[in-house]
Regions:
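FAD-binding beta-loop-beta segment adjacent to the flavin cofactor pocket
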Residues: 311-342, 466-477, 490-505, 512
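Predominantly flavin-linked oxidoreductase catalytic cores and closely associated redox partners
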Residues: 127, 136-299, 338, 357, ...
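N-terminal Rossmann-like FAD-binding beta1-loop-alpha1 element of flavoenzymes
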Residues: 18-50
Length: 561
C-alpha cells in the first residue's frame, strides 16, 4: 500500500501541537531544546519543546571520536562538571604522526599547526555525553520521544514547514499493514529544527525544496569508522591523543587515523576517509583494518580486546558549502547544515553552539507571537559568533588536501602555523569545491584492483563480526529502508562500470552482489546490517540509492562510543 492509501484507510493521523519540534537527539538538537527551556524559565513563561530521536534511546546512534572542545557546553550549562556530565579526561599529550608503511615520524610540538593543539579539550564518549544531556533536558521540562523516526516533513497551505509526521509501525516487507500496525502521528510546531546529523534524510529534502544550497559549494563528506577497545592497564595512557596521516592512503585519497586514550583503560580509534576518492576498488573499512597493523598503532592494542564498532558519514566542514540555514517554519543546525570543523576534527562544539543560536531565534519568535516564518536572527547571530570566525579560519583545509598530500601539508602549515605567527588570523584567500563527492568516482578499468589482507580476528576483523558488536538490529519484517530509484542500475551501471563499489564503501556489509540461478548478477540489500552511516546515499555514483527512515528504534545501539 502507498502512504496515501494507508492514510485513506486508517487516517487521519493523531496530531500533537508544540511550539518547537526538534528532529534528532544529538548534541545539537538537545542543546536547542535545553536553551529554549532555559530562556523560558528565565523569563517566566512556558514554551513547549519536544525532541524526536530515532534511536532506541538518546545516545544509541551517537558516534564520534571524540576530542571535545568544552567551550559551547560551558556556555550552555556552565556548571556541567558539578552536575556530573561525563566529560572527565583532559587531553594530556598531542602526537601527530606521519606514517610510512612501517615507520612513523612525530611532528615536533613547536611545528604543530594550531588546529592540532587540543589544550583544554577532553577525550570523551559523545554517546555518554548525549545520554547525560538528554537526562538534563528532561529534568528542565523537555519532552523526548526515543524510538520515533521523523519520516515526513509537513507543510502548511503557504508552503511553510509546520512540523513532521513519524513513521508508521508494523508495515511488512510487502508494504502491507501487519497485525502490529500503528499509524504514525503528526507533530505540529511553530518552528521545526532539523538536527539529524550529516546528510539528514529530511534536511536533504528541505535543502532541495527551498533551494538552500543555491550559489554554495557542493557539500563534501568523509566516512569515519571507529572501534572501541579495552586495553591492559599497563598500556593505558589516559589523555593521549594521536592523529596520523600518510600510510595507508595514496596521494589521490584524503584520510587519516585517530587514536585516543580515555579513562578506565579504554582506547577509541578509527579512520576518516574523504568520500571524494576516485578508485572504486578502495574500501574504507579495509583501509581502517590495514591501518591498525602499523607498528605505531598496533603497539597500543597488544593484549587488548575490541568491544565496540560503528561508522558515520561526517561533513568536511567548509563555510563555502554551508547552505542557507533557515526557511519558512524551520532551521538546520549542526551537521545537518554542515558546521563540523574538519581541520580540528571536531563537530560537537559546533553542533551545540549552532543549536543555541537557533534556540535563541526560535524563542524570541515564539515569544513575539510569530509562527512558521524565517528565523533570520539565527544566521545573523551565527555570522557574529566565535563559531563563524573559527570555521572561516580553517575554510581551506580540506580543499588544499584535494590537491594532494604534499600541497595540503605545506598550505596547512602556511595557513595554520605561519600566518597566525605573523598576526594573520584568517587566510586572505578562499578556495572553492566544484563537484559533489560521487562525481569523482572513476571506472574500475582505470584503476588497479586492491587486494586487502584477510582479517586475523585479533587485531583486524571482517564486517559482519564488526556489525555484531555495534548491537545493530532492525525489525526484519519491514520494507527495506535502503531504496533504489531504478532497480536495474546496480547491475547495469554500478557493477558493469565501477565493479560494484557499494559492496566496498559500505562499512556494514549491506550491499552484496550475488548470482541468480541462471548465473546472472543481482544486488542483494541486507538492510538489517545498516548502521545508518549514510555513505551509500552520498557515494553512489548514479545517486540511485536513497536512504529513508526504517522503523523507530532500529539501527545501532552504541554504548560508550
Amino acid at each position: 500500500m502507498t502512504q496515501e492509501e494507508i492514510l485513506a484507510q486508517f487516517g487521519p493521523r493523531e496530531a500533537m501541537e508544540y511550539d518547537v519540534v526538534v528532529i534528532g537527539g544529538g548534541p545539537g538538537g538537545l542543546a536547542t531544546a535545553i536553551r529554549i527551556k532555559q530562556l523560558a524559565a528565565e523569563k517566566g513563561n512556558d514554551v513547549s519543546v519536544v525532541v524526536l530521536e530515532k534511536g532506541s534511546e538518546p545516545g544509541a546512534h551517537i558516534l564520534s571520536g571524540a576530542v571535545m572542545d568544552p567551550k559551547a557546553i560551558t556556555e550552555l550549562i556552565p556548571n556541567w562538571k558539578e552536575l556530573g556530565c561525563p566529560i572527565n579526561q583532559k587531553v594530556t599529550s598531542d602526537d601527530v604522526l606521519i606514517l610510512s608503511e612501517t615507520g612513523a615520524q612525530r611532528t615536533p610540538d613547536w611545528l604543530l599547526p594550531r588546529n592540532f593543539h587540543n589544550d583544554d579539550c577532553y577525550v570523551v564518549s559523545l554517546s555518554n555525553v548525549v545520554k547525560w544531556m538528554a537526562a538534563h533536558a528532561e529534568s528542565i521540562g523537555v519532552e523526548i520521544f526515543p524510538g520515533f523516526t521523523a519520516a515526513e516533513v509537513l507543510y502548511d497551505e503557504h508552503g511553510a514547514v509546520k512540523g513532521v509526521a513519524t513513521g508508521n509501525l508494523g508495515i511488512g516487507k510487502d508494504g502491507e499493514p501487519t497485525e502490529n500496525f500503528q499509524l504514525g502521528m503528526e507533530l505540529h510546531a511553530k518552528y521545526t529544527i532539523f538536527a539529524e546529523g550529516a546528510r539528514g534524510h529530511l534536511g536533504k529534502q528541505v535543502i532541495a525544496k527551498y533551494k538552500l544550497a543555491e550559489g554554495r559549494d557542493p557539500q563534501s563528506y568523509a566516512i569515519g569508522i571507529k572501534e572501541l577497545w579495552e586495553v591492559d592497564p599497563s598500556k593505558a595512557k589516559p589523555g593521549l591523543v594521536v592523529h596520523t596521516s600518510g600510510w595507508p592512503m595514496q596521494d589521490d585519497a584524503f584520510g587519516g587515523g585517530f587514536l585516543y586514550h580515555l579513562e578506565d583503560n579504554k582506547v577509541t580509534l578509527g579512520f576518516v576517509l574523504g568520500l571524494d576518492y576516485k578508485n572504486p576498488w578502495l574500501s574504507p573499512f579495509e583501509e581502517m583494518q590495514r591501518w591498525k597493523t602499523h607498528p605505531a598503532i598496533a603497539a597500543h592494542l597488544e593484549g587488548a580486546k575490541r568491544i565496540g564498532y560503528g561508522a558515520r558519514a561526517i561533513n568536511n566542514g567548509t563555510p563555502q558549502a554551508l547552505p542557507k540555514t533557515v526557511f519558512p517554519g524551520g532551521a538546520l543546525i549542526g551537521c545537518d547544515a554542515g558546521y563540523l570543523n574538519a581541520a580540528r576534527i571536531k563537530g560537537s562544539h559546533a553542533a551545540i553552539k549552532s543549536g543555541m543560536l537557533a534556540a535563541d531565534a526560535a524563542y524570541e519568535a515564539v515569544s513575539a507571537g510569530r509562527a512558521n516564518d524565517e528565523l533570520s536572527a539565527y544566521p545573523a547571530a551565527f555570522e557574529k559568533s566565535w563559531l563563524s570566525k573559527e570555521l572561516n579560519q580553517y575554510r581551506n583545509f580540506k580543499l588544499w588536501f584535494k590537491k594532494g598530500m604534499l600541497v595540503g601539508t605545506v598550505m596547512t602549515g602556511i595557513e595554520q602555523w605561519l600566518l597566525p605567527k605573523l598576526g594573520i588570523d584568517t587566510p586572505p584567500w578562499t578556495l572553492h569545491g566544484d563537484k559533489p563527492d560521487h562525481v569523482n568516482l572513476e571506472p574500475a578499468a582505470q584503476h588497479a584492483q586492491i587486494n586487502y589482507p584477510k582479517p586475523d580476528g585479533k587485531l583486524t576483523f571482517d564486517r559482519l563480526s564488526s556489525v555484531f558488536i555495534s548491537n545493530t538490529n532492525h525489525e526484519e519484517n519491514q520494507p527495506a529502508h535502503l531504496t533504489l530509484k531504478d532497480a536495474s542500475v546496480p547491475v547495469n551501471i554500478n557493477l558493469a562500470t565501477y565493479a560494484g563499489p557499494e559492496s566496498r564503501y559500505c562499512p556494514a556489509g549491506v550491499y552484496e552482489y550475488v548470482k541468480n540461478d541462471d548465473n546472472t548478477d543481482r544486488l542483494q540489500i541486507n538492510a538489517q546490517n545498516c548502521v545508518h552511516c549514510k555513505t551509500c546515499d552520498i557515494k553512489d555514483p548514479t545517486q540511485n540509492i536513497v536512504w529513508v527512515t526504517p522503523e523507530g528504534g532500529g539501527g545501532p545501539n552504541y554504548s560508550g562510543m
